Amino acid sequence: MKIAIDAMGGDHAPKEIVIGAQKAIEHFQDIEITLVGNETLIRPYITNDERLSIIHTEQVIEATDEPVRAVRRKKEASMVLMANEVSEGRAHACISAGNTGALMAAGLFIVGRIDGIDRPALAPTLPTIDGKGFVLLDVGANVDARPEHILQYALMGAAYAEKVRGIHRPRIGLLNVGTEDQKGNELAKKTFQLIQDTSLNFVGNVEARDLLEGVADVVVTDGFTGNVALKTIEGTAIAVFSMLKSALTSNVVSKMAALALKPQLMQLKKKMDYAEYGGAALFGLRAPVIKAHGSSDAHAIFHAVRQAREMVVNDVIQTVKQSIAEIKQ
């Protein structure tokens, strides 16, 4: 199995990307990795090139580039060449921590959509109090959606949760303003009915305040609402940890308490760390495409590789195809 990685994408590229890739190769004996980027910058961080190859290019899609234009005009950009490796059959999956919009464009225009999927969805796995996490989609691949699009999100999310996360009959929830069946706008009401009419393990409407309680294994919504929910969760987590740090360093007594609680605090931090869950999968494409967080370190890249590998090994794409075909019948 070969995985292509954009070595130049992200805040800490190429160093953390290369280190994370090597860590994955050492851990998983059945993978090969192709790093795409400036070989002069990549090579100093390689300590073992076994099952590791480089495609050299000096062109990069920047965070400030307009996504679609960049993908179409920068034909030699590391992200574009990475996507080409997948579309031309030389790699089974790809990963980038670079420009999110550009990666979605590359996935759509180069890797291509699965037949029957109207719109891809961006789906991160977020932490929950019990440590199991949940998949949220869409978080911004498409800000608008129709009920049938969100139904497809539910099918794709269920396939991923079952095949990759090992959850038998994952619970599917629809993000809404209340838990009652008839709550929400027309989009929510029509989507509710569509999902309810399938064989999915649909638990109904779920509220944003209950997401981190683990109320569902997969939560679906339109991209606008999902992105707002994601950013709210991220911002709240940052604020809480900041307030906690301030309170525990305010005086000598609190500093002593912090020292005593250090193991528990580190455990909490690890439980809430996005890196433990890999990246956000771009569902609906013909091959696994993973968007790693822009600030990903080597640890996060390792888990993104693990995630991509599991999607390939468990044939998630084929499961999605079958699910969509059954709904279309």
UniProtKB/Swiss-Prot annotation:
Keywords: Cytoplasm, Lipid biosynthesis, Lipid metabolism, Phospholipid biosynthesis, Phospholipid metabolism, Transferase. Pfam families: FA_synthesis. GO terms for molecular function: phosphate:acyl-[acyl carrier protein] acyltransferase activity. It is found in: Cytoplasm. InterPro entries: FA_synthesis (IPR003664), Phospholipid_synth_PlsX-like (IPR012281). It catalyses: a fatty acyl-[ACP] + phosphate = an acyl phosphate + holo-[ACP]. Pathway: Lipid metabolism; phospholipid metabolism. One of its GO terms (cellular component) is cytoplasm. Its main location: cytoplasm. Its EC number is 2.3.1.274. Catalyzes the reversible formation of acyl-phosphate (acyl-PO(4)) from acyl-[acyl-carrier-protein] (acyl-ACP). This enzyme utilizes acyl-ACP as fatty acyl donor, but not acyl-CoA. Belongs to the PlsX family. HAMAP family: PlsX. Homodimer. Probably interacts with PlsY. This is Phosphate acyltransferase.
